[in-house]
Amino acid sequence: MSKQGLTAGLAEAVRTSQPEHSVDAIHEAKKGLLDFTAASFAGREDKGIQKLLRLIEDEGGRPLVPVIGQGKKAAPLQSAMLNGFIAHALDFDDVHSDVRGHPSAVIVPALIASAARGHDERLLGAYVVGVEVMARLGESIGSRHYEKGWHNTGTLGAIAAACAVGYAEELTQEELEKAIGFAATQSAGMRVQFGTEMKPLHAGLAAQAGLLAVKLAQSEFGGSRTALDGETGFFSLYGDVEKAQHTLLNDWGAPWRIVQPGLWFKIYPFCSAAHHAADAVRQLISEETISAANTERIEVIFPPGGDAALTERSPKAGEEGRFSVEYVIALALHGHGLTVEHFSSQPIPNGVQTTMGRIQRVYDNAIQPAPHAVPKGRFTIVRAYLSDGRICEARVDCPKGAPGNELSEEDIIEKLTLTVPQEKARRIITAVEKADIKEFLAHIE
């Protein structure tokens, strides 16, 4: 990188970006916007939404921005928080392997709030820039950040959202440097909250923080212009400043991270770390006719640390089960679909809980990861020991939806039409195809 600091360098990279020149990047942004909308409408009845709506209605504010799927509007900062929560409520929103978290649930709500205030022309390009920033932050912060217990969606998302909105609203170099700092000082989110309502709120709070950071910078509020740098800066506190100096800005946009490796669009409403196992157990059910009735026990084999996000081993409700490979496998073995209704606050049936007790996690660092694995170095093997003495197993390195095994545009449209009334879905799809953001906003409320 150049001799300028990380904060100044990032601000300059954002300010001078030209993502609109990449047909592929804008195409992927449109797919991402449709998937974001599908995930948001799927989560529109989550009980946490009404709690947050009551909170902001008590506070008041100017209702300018649509709250997705609620038939209401909210003030910009409030909407960013709400829409981030809604998008991430079911863990049905996209992930990015470089981020080790959820970029769109943070970036898009902040951009929707910005667009509703008249900054809609550059939304798709700003989305590309936001994903670029968040992916590079994830790569630069290092794996130890997540392993220590930080939730990257929250800790990296605020800066990414600030950069995305800063690009959309064409901030100056000084304003961007300050906005990055204002976002960095609000960066937070702990994995101890996984399996609770607070976990998806991390996305909402990060979106809100990024939007607030831009508004503060535009208001000439005072703050550091070097918040990513030095011994007390973001990377020194949260990760590895030396690594960041080599990775944060190199080969910016070449290719754009929204294109390569790309967003991972989900077919299941639970943590992506369990998607490998879900595909594997469904394969065994289909090919080997295994079930809860004929399976004595199951081993789920990960590389060390491959299940770090799967914090729940004995969940009591489907909501906690979003982070439990035991629940996902047991649910499938009992013949249930891995669909939204099974990952709510309802208690887990006794039979499923009994089967969960026969599922054991195993870690093996001798197994060679596949070159095409997503995320890099990851795999899951599901090995079933059957009552007739057979042992059968299935290995998945790149689950359905992940880059390299991605969902088609038609798959994403189907995901949207399953959660949105047909006419509304048609209007949303047309608006996104035409990059008509005003029309898009008119139909997501």
Swiss-Prot record:
GO molecular function: lyase activity
Protein name according to UniProt: Uncharacterized protein YxeQ
Family: Belongs to the PrpD family.
Source lineage: Bacteria, Bacillati, Bacillota, Bacilli, Bacillales
InterPro entries: MmgE/PrpD_sf, MmgE/PrpD_sf_1, MmgE/PrpD_sf_2, MmgE_PrpD, MmgE_PrpD_C, MmgE_PrpD_N
Highest taxon listed in the record's lineage: Bacteria
